[in-house]
Amino acid sequence: TSAQWMINLMLAQKGGNYLDADGNVNITSDEMIEVLTYIKEMQDTGAFATIPGGQPDNEEAYPFYNSGDYAAQIMPFWQTSRYTNYMTDLKGKVAIAAVPAFEGSVVQTIGGGGTGTAVVASGEHADLAAEVMAYIKLSAEASKEIWNVLGFDPVNTEVWTDTELTQNPDNQFVQYFTTYPFDVLNEVKDSIGLLTCFTDEKMPSINNEF
């Protein structure tokens, strides 16, 4: 319950943000009220439920997916590795699909962290570190291994259409899921948005509110 992946997504679909026009933290906006009201109503009908452990990537949650108590989750792409590592019984039974969107939404999905990585500007070799970081995050070579090893969606979207990579029958993630994961990414590629507050220094304060 301390993670807001689904709330972030729905808020972006509504065109909202956690900051107001003046850059102040605002978690009571009209868009946020609409999102939380929708979630509560879905919970009241029994369609939504909080997973044991509070969020889908906690170890307490995995047995309940394995047993079929929960049919779906809305999570960032890095969750693929949790399936291959912790929910092996579900191999060949899980599909990756585009998330539902509110009618009229320009944004269908957003990027969701995840653990951030930064280069300290005051470091002795900050420029070199930045070059290395850019290579391992953005180059085609590194992007392919980000998918092959970690199961993450690479930031470099050029590799998304490389079917030798994305449909490789020897890839553990291609073998696990019943759909080609990158087919979904390419389907929503032009409607990926973001919450601008993600890069704001106030983001930790927003997390504290929840």
Cite the ranges covered by each PLM segment:
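Extracytoplasmic/periplasmic solute-binding protein
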Residues: T1-V25, E31, K40, A61, ...
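Non-transmembrane alpha-helical segments in soluble domains
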Residues: N8, L36-D44, Y62, N66, ...
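Glycine-centered hinge/linker elements that transmit conformational signals in sensory
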Residues: N24-G54, V99
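Extracytoplasmic/periplasmic substrate-recognition and gating elements
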Residues: T45-F48, N85-V159
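Short helix-initiation/N-cap motifs at beta->coil->alpha
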Residues: I51-N66
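Beta->alpha turn/N-cap motifs
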Residues: N58, M75-Y83, T115
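Paired acidic/hydrophobic, glycine-rich loop segments that form the ligand-binding mouth/hinge
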Residues: A71-P76, A95
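C-terminal capping/gating helix-and-loop segments adjacent to ligand/active sites or protein-protein/ligand interfaces
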Residues: V174-F210
